[in-house]
């Protein structure tokens, strides 16, 4: 997320890149207002079209709209900021992030929640971290294809369960 202020409120903006001009929708209120981008008026040079049809809805991956190289820089910055609390000279000790060969379908583990609503009973997906609603996904772009396949096989057959995990070999 990136932060913004509006009428004295601090906003955590998901789906935006620092410096962009965007329209947002407030989806939750904690100490800050939690917002999702609904329209990009002036995009950042590192913005890309993400592949995920559930982007921002499931709240799982938050960088899919950013070029991969920039994602690595952002993630390195997050790690540095956390570690600076413990070591003021951390900048000199952290190497560059080693990029992965795979930009998608790399995760080999997932934990899914199972729907208890009558309409979707036994189907599974992810819980949105802000709305706490189950998002029934059709496919997760960052999950290994074996996980997507197994989740689809199990769909509709999970009555009585609340969660389950899948882990697959990547070989």
Regions found by a protein language model. Give the residues of each.
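Accessory RNA-recognition modules of RNA-modification enzymes
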Residues: 1-171
């Amino acid at each position: 997320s990136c932060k913004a202020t509006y009428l004295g409120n601090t906003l955590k903006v998901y789906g935006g890149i620092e410096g962009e001009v965007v329209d947002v929708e407030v989806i939750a209120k904690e100490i800050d207002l939690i917002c999702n981008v609904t329209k990009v008026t002036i995009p950042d040079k590192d913005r890309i079209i993400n592949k995920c049809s559930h982007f921002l809805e499931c709240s799982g991956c938050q960088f899919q709209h950013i070029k991969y190289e920039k994602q690595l820089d952002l993630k390195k910055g997050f790690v540095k900021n956390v570690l600076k609390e413990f070591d003021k000279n951390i900048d000199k000790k952290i190497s560059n992030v080693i990029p992965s060969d795979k930009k998608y379908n790399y995760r080999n583990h997932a934990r899914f929640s199972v729907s208890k609503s009558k309409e979707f009973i036994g189907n599974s997906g992810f819980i949105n971290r802000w709305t706490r609603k189950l998002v029934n996904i059709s496919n997760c772009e960052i999950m290994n294809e074996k996980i997507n396949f197994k989740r689809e096989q199990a769909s509709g057959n999970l009555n009585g369960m609340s969660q389950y995990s899948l882990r697959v070999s990547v070989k």
